[in-house]
Amino acid sequence: MVPFWTTVSRNGSSDSETTLQSASKATKQYKYPSLRPSHRLSLLFLFPFHLSANGACFRCTCFSHFKLELRRMGNESYEDAIEALKKLLIEKDDLKDVAAAKVKKITAELQAASSSDSKSFDPVERIKEGFVTFKKEKYETNPALYGELAKGQSPKYMVFACSDSRVCPSHVLDFHPGDAFVVRNIANMVPPFDKVKYAGVGAAIEYAVLHLKVENIVVIGHSACGGIKGLMSFPLDGNNSTDFIEDWVKICLPAKSKVLAESESSAFEDQCGRCEREAVNVSLANLLTYPFVREGVVKGTLALKGGYYDFVNGSFELWELQFGISPVHSI
């Protein structure tokens, strides 16, 4: 048996020294306008047919490699490559009917796979289907709820949660529309009061506390948080490698310092787990730098709570920031 990409004569002899020349000659004979030269050569080298000495028996041994190469070519050149290969295999004298039949079968399989892949995810269709499902199963079945929401909102909670796609607070805590005023960001952090650097967060807190009159602010951390991992990994030399992320997660540097001081010898994963919770406490303390939050806590109209969602083990922890004023002592 000799590989197809070597020169095969009618009497079965081969010349391995002319391998590249033969492949190049074949690719020049059958032009693929939309393929790069490297793809043209790979059509032959990744699709080896083996011939017997008399050229009468064919066996393809590398279909999987060929499939990968076709997918790499992209959608525009796919059909051209298929047609060119069919022409090459069907018209070339050395290839018999069994090879042509085999190619037709492979072609059908590749086309079916390509069609399936191209239809696997349509972002616009996914959004359409999602809204249709929501409207049918929730909106239209709860006219009273959505009728009230059309008049305004009065949520009991303000929630700070991470932007991580795995930890949507409405999903995790089964909140309904109107239950929670939600702010999501990297690592669920609350920065200290700063009208310049953190005006967006300040505006959200001010609106929730003074206008919506929320009764609870909950900061929820979570397991395997990428933001906290970054905080624990980034160097403290001031040389940032990111435009925004490092400056943002440094909000909770006190949490990192506390964890390193208390568990310097622990494994990095354990340190991150401790910091995920400790960063929540830093954010709770930062909330007290907002005058209207502090006033609400002192008056008892506002409670600050910390939470931690472990999606690996399916557990949730909740704790409350205790705040009090010591009695006045006359001296």
Swiss-Prot record:
Reversible hydration of carbon dioxide. This isoform ensures the supply of bicarbonate for pep carboxylase. It catalyses: hydrogencarbonate + H(+) = CO2 + H2O. The modification Phosphotyrosine is found at Y198. Belongs to the beta-class carbonic anhydrase family. InterPro entries: Beta_CA_cladeB, Carbonic_anhydrase, Carbonic_anhydrase_CS, Carbonic_anhydrase_sf. GO terms for molecular function: carbonate dehydratase activity; zinc ion binding. This is Beta carbonic anhydrase 2, chloroplastic. Its EC number is 4.2.1.1. Residues 1-71 form a transit peptide. SMART domains: Pro_CA. Disulfide bonds: none annotated. GO terms for cellular component: apoplast; chloroplast; chloroplast envelope; chloroplast stroma; chloroplast thylakoid membrane; cytoplasm; cytosol; plastid. The gene is BCA2. It comes from Arabidopsis thaliana. The modification S-nitrosocysteine is found at C275. GO terms for biological process: carbon utilization. The keyword Iron-sulfur does not apply. The modification Phosphothreonine is found at T107. Induction: Expression reduced by 20% under dark conditions. Pathway: Photosynthesis; C4 acid pathway. It comes from the Eukaryota. Pfam families: Pro_CA. Keywords: Acetylation, Chloroplast, Cytoplasm, Lyase, Phosphoprotein, Plastid, S-nitrosylation, Transit peptide, Zinc. The modification Phosphoserine is found at S170. Strongly expressed in aerial tissues including leaves, stems, flowers and siliques. Accumulates in mesophyll cells.
